Amino acid sequence: PDESMDPEAAYRFIHDELMLDGSSRLNLATFVTTWMDPEAEKLMAETFDKNMIDKDEYPATAAIEARCVSMVADLFHAEGLRDHDPTSATGVSTIGSSEAVMLGGLALKWRWRQRVGSWKGRMPNLVMGSNVQVVWEKFCRYFDVEPRYLPMERGRYVITPEQVLAAVDENTIGVVAILGTTYTGELEPIAEICAALDKLAAGGGVDVPVHVDAASGGFVVPFLHPDLVWDFRLPRVVSINVSGHKYGLTYPGVGFVVWRGPEHLPEDLVFRVNYLGGDMPTFTLNFSRPGNQVVGQYYNFLRLGRDGYTKVMQALSHTARWLGDQLREVDHCEVISDGSAIPVVSFRLAGDRGYTEFDVSHELRTFGWQVPAYTMPDNATDVAVLRIVVREGLSADLARALHDDAVTALAALDKVKPGGHFDAQHFAH
């Protein structure tokens, strides 16, 4: 516009348009946090103007970031951590898991270069399931790495150790294993994959590291399943990424990537910048970004502690498992994941109902619920599923309302049998 307007009018204009987005609390498609304590919101509002990169100018914010990284590294059992020394952890905060994945992948590629010596003329590859988040495809394309996708099949939506062993070779920079897939919420068999790679290396085969994509499960599994070994307790795991704005319970966007130790982050990737009077080591793709997301994450760490996170995850898991049990009793539904691994329930229609999962998703929208329907990855694209992500804010009362609305929607579709008017859609992360 050429002319200015009254601030209240500008606010109202934008506020009214945003009402068309609908309620984020009823958006069961997203893993992203949609509710925080008012005190956290106040802290974040007070610090949104602080630039995370200006560490000399905002030393308290920089110290908070280092403490967050150290706590994440400790949660995942990283090596060489020293009490009262947050800088002993090797890792960084990021704008989200997408940036964290890029940084973890770059470290794998540089370590592969160091391992093979003369790497020019060789094409590095990365082994992962076809169920990975799209950022892994972006990483391979942007940084010239061959993606080796391991296919799914009907009834199995995670990768297997046998698939991994058949795919790795001397040009493999690493294997990606997922702690909580975005398609179904299932946990991949990380310990079994590492054991298979250990046996391969011990027999004179290639020595391939593992990166764990814990974007969805990294802040769930340590509290719900503390005895499950998937992290740096496995010597083959060299790096882990996690999203703070998912089950870290913080508004977007914040994530972390941590390494088992400093030797797994090549020094060539760390820039030392003389910026605003300070020598600042940095390993990020972004430069300027607000510090308030890290402050919000720090608030959650202090406010909840291990005990609080455990109680929150147990409550979410209870709600998810209740939903899974209720859906299992509906003869229309075949439950794929019941919410016991992480608080995600995925299900599909049982048999030929005369309509599709996409019709169910559309019908639920008439009640205000956003429940995504999508087809599974290669080679299971003939399978369509619906997914419910249980987050803070989805109370037991809302879960009961969702169940009742789902039963009503299925009954309505039984009467009209639209025959699948809505086209199949592939997964959108």
Region locations from a protein language model:
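N-terminal entrance/gating region of PLP-dependent enzymes' catalytic architecture
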Residues: 1-88, 368, 406, 429
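Secondary-structure capping and boundary motifs in well-ordered enzyme cores
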Residues: 60, 93-100, 128, 132, ...
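Buried hydrophobic packing segments
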Residues: 65, 69-72, 100-109, 136, ...
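Short Gly/Ser/Thr- and Asp/Glu-enriched loop/turn motifs at secondary-structure junctions
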Residues: 86-88, 121, 337-344, 381-383
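Conserved PLP-enzyme active-site core in the AAT-like
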Residues: 92-268
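PLP-dependent enzyme catalytic core of the Aspartate aminotransferase-like
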Residues: 200, 380-429
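Active-site C-terminal subdomain of aminotransferase-like
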Residues: 206, 223-226, 230-343, 348-352
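Conserved PLP-binding active-site segment of the aspartate aminotransferase-like
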Residues: 343-355, 368-403
